[in-house]
A protein has these predicted regions:
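Class I SAM-dependent methyltransferase SAM/SAH-binding core
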Residues: 46, 52-105
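A short glycine-rich, Lys/Arg-flanked "PGG" loop and its adjoining helix->strand segment in the class I
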Residues: 129-141
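Short conserved loop adjoining the S-adenosyl-L-methionine
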Residues: 106-111
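Conserved SAM-binding loop and adjacent beta-strand
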Residues: 14-31
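Acceptor-substrate binding/catalytic loop of class I
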Residues: 157-172
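A conserved beta-strand element that flanks and buttresses the S-adenosyl-L-methionine
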Residues: 118
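N-terminal, positively charged/glycine-rich alpha-helical extensions of SAM-dependent methyltransferases
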Residues: 1-14
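Conserved beta-strand signature within the Rossmann-like core of class I S-adenosyl-L-methionine
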Residues: 143-149
Length: 207
């Protein structure tokens, strides 16, 4: 068991409650809705580093209904909490989402499996180039990656210590992303929303 897996296995319930209180789901859903992503009834989506399912739930809250979303995380307990949320949420059915325990650096999927990949606050736990390369591998050509990294800030400095991760500079994110993706857009969440205190968003298209 890795340190990251052990950490999130221990705090899954508390982490989920914190995310509900600070409104992350609504913030992500609002932006995803504005993107008008090319998600069709036969599309496959991956939420890489899904945690307790916040971004997956935001996707469905935004009105998207792909054929299937795979919610992948290294933490079994986080996936258990996520599965319970998927069961209880009115906008998601059991057939919509499949929780998968796995490692971001060795995704258990074939090359070019997904039309859209979402990842939020997960690449901070792995070497950035390796993580982006693996996400690019499973994404179809011209597919979309919605990348929500931690951005350098006072809040993220505190979170680095609390959650034992490494914040990548935005310059590093742009440079490394450019090896595999075209940067289509960069969204700054409003500072009035808690997600804006520590996160930003890049919209990327696989080359």
């Amino acid at each position: 068991m890795t340190k990251t897996q052990d950490l999130y296995d221990r705090i899954a319930d508390v982490q989920n409650l914190a995310m509900k209180i600070n409104g992350y789901r609504d913030s992500v859903a609002k932006y995803l809705r504005s993107l008008e992503l090319d998600i069709k009834p036969d599309s496959l989506v991956l939420d890489a580093g899904s945690g307790t399912g916040l971004v997956t739930l935001a996707l469905y809250s935004a009105g998207y209904h792909p054929k299937k979303t795979f919610a992948l995380d290294i933490s079994y307990n986080s996936l258990t909490v996520a599965a319970q949320q998927f069961h209880e949420d009115k906008q998601v059915t059991a057939e919509d989402v499949e929780p998968v325990q796995g490692n971001l650096l060795s995704l258990p999927f074939r090359d070019e499996s997904f039309d859209v990949v979402l990842t939020c606050g997960a690449l901070e736990y792995v070497p950035l180039d390796n993580g982006l390369q693996e996400l690019a591998r499973v994404l179809k050509k011209d597919g979309t990656l919605v990348l929500i990294p931690v951005r350098p800030s006072l809040v993220s400095s505190f979170l680095e210590v609390l959650y034992n991760f490494k914040t990548h500079s935005l310059e590093e994110v742009r440079e490394t992303s450019g090896r595999y993706f075209e940067i289509v857009g960069n969204h700054k969440f409003p500072i009035t929303e808690p997600i804006g205190w520590s996160k930003t968003l890049f919209l990327l298209q696989k080359k």
